[in-house]
């Protein structure tokens, strides 16, 4: 616990700048740092409706007014230990940080890029909107952060993601004018995160914003190059600095006359951008600041652009073909669990590919991915072993309620779920299992958490060690 209040850690230069920016609102802004933090979660609506989530969630939640699938939860709750979280039914996210993805109108079937995606806050939201159709490219330049990104995409059950670890410049060579929608949540000075991460407040310097502004201007131009005509680009930061906000927006408008700044949805507490904080372009008023003294959140900035021209949904379809051995053992497994659909969609054998005994389910939209550093192309289904197929944890999480017949569903209050998540074997009553033996999906309220193998009344735990709580 810090010995100092946040306001005591804030740089005088930061406070002076905020006073100049906010004028009469400055005192309210300063007092917001003394208020308790807000905690939020976002429901995975590709798996569960908000009404159903509210019915089964075992702790109190309150809707976030400006996010249709967002909820506040109390500070003393630990949602990550809840079986519903381990089933990928919700994601923990700071409330104002939910806003960028919610303001980018993604439609199933589109090609979507999250350029600086780790740890997956926005990518999981975009993937849920695509609902298994189209292509999500989730990229991060940091290898370690990209691994965290992959884990969250797998936890959310996203089947159509291409997770890359690339520089934006190299990515752009492979995807010129390829994406219908792009989200650029740029690396920033994090002024909207000071209450959450005190080190950011302690280490803040005026020079940091100027340095980051140069990077952000480079990134936003690279993003524009990858956006197809008629496509939308959402730029966001979690900072208040004009150098990283209005000035970056101005830079794009000055250098790309084919990009237009659009109006964002209005909500009480949204604050319009200030043209004078950029190059004076009157359209900067269409960008939006989220300040902590006006909303229940830490703070954010966002701007939505449209590229001139018309767009379409035409894309190259994936055309993999499983080898005979893969098809034989995978087909037997799918029959054993009674697979009806995968992620609510018919299983497509043309998307199955085997690489070194690992079986993948490719995104429905293909592309030229040669020469790119990637962690995952599509869904990792499992491994070919000697005379059998062994399913993966991402495969289990990609399945939705009703996708398979061989299930053991327990109520969210059942302590056996916690024991399963710790790697323990479970005792299962005959009436609780769909079949007398074999592979089953263990579910919470019908929503898959992971696989197990039933032998008599014992469910052998197949929850991987690296996923256990």
Label the model's feature ranges:
Residues 179, 232-235, 240-360:
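Class I S-adenosyl-L-methionine
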Residues 1-21, 25-54, 298-301, 308-469:
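Polybasic, low-complexity RNA-engagement segments
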Residues 109-118, 137:
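Conserved class I S-adenosyl-L-methionine
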Residues 39-98:
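Conserved AdoMet
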Residues 139-177, 184:
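S-adenosyl-L-methionine
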Residues 144, 180-221, 238-245, 271, ...:
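Mobile active-site "lid"/loop adjacent to the S-adenosyl-L-methionine
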Residues 119-132:
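Conserved SAM-binding loop of SAM-dependent methyltransferases across substrates and taxa
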